[in-house]
Amino acid sequence: MSRLSIATTERYTKDFRVNYIDTDLDSPINIKTVLTKLGVLALFRSLSEGLCGLSIRSTTDDRFMLINSNNNIGRQHFTVAHELYHLYYGTNTVPHICRLGGKEPEEVNADSFASALLMPEKGLIQQLPGEEYRSGKISMATLLRTERVFGVSHDALLIRLLKLHIINDATYQQFKSVTITSEAARYGYDTSLYRPGNNGLYIGTLGEMAKKEFDRGKISEGHYLEILNMLPNERQEA
C-alpha cells in the first residue's frame, strides 16, 4: 500500500473512534481500556532491542498483539495504537512485526494513525494555553502535563506538535535534547510514563482464545494446558 494522505489518516482515526470504540473525536483515550473493549488480546513481554511489538489477525478475525515491555510506557501505548492500524486497516493476516524506525509506507501510515488516534488535533490544541499555542512557544510544563493527559512519550508529543505546525523545528530540537525523566521529576511528576513497565501483563481472555484455537485444532492439548497453567502467574487487566 502507498503512503496515506494526512486527510485519509485522519478519516481512519475518526472512523475508528466512532465505529470501533464508540467515543468522541477529541478526548484522550485509555489504550488498555480500548483493547479490552475491542476484545484484542495483548501480551506485554521483554523482547529484543529495537523490536516494538507484533500483531496478527486470524482468518476468523481474532486479533492478538505482543508489546515490548522494555520500552517506556508511553512508547508502549504508541505501539499498541500502531498495531491497531495493522489489525483493523491492514490487508493481510500474516504476523506483522514492528521495529523502531520502520520507513516502509505501511509503517509510516501506522505511525501517523497512532499519533492522530492518541492525540487528536482539536483535543490536543485544547490542552495548550492560548498564548503558547498562538506563539508556538510551548513551555516544558505544558509538554509534561499534555504527555500525561494523552499517555504518550515525550518524543511522540513533540513529533505530533511539529507535524501540526504548532512548534517549529528549532523548538522541536530544543525539547528533544532534554532528559525527560529529570525534567518530569523536577516538575514534581511521577516518571513511570517514561520508563519501562508492564512486564508480564496481559489484557483480554487468554484462556478463552487458547480454547478456541485448541477446538480448531490449531494448538496441541499440551500447549493448551501449558497456557492455562501459566495464567495464575500472570498479571491480568481486563
Question: Model-found features: residue ranges?
Answer:
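Active-site hotspot residues in diverse enzymes, especially metal/ion-binding acidic/histidine motifs
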Residues: 1-238
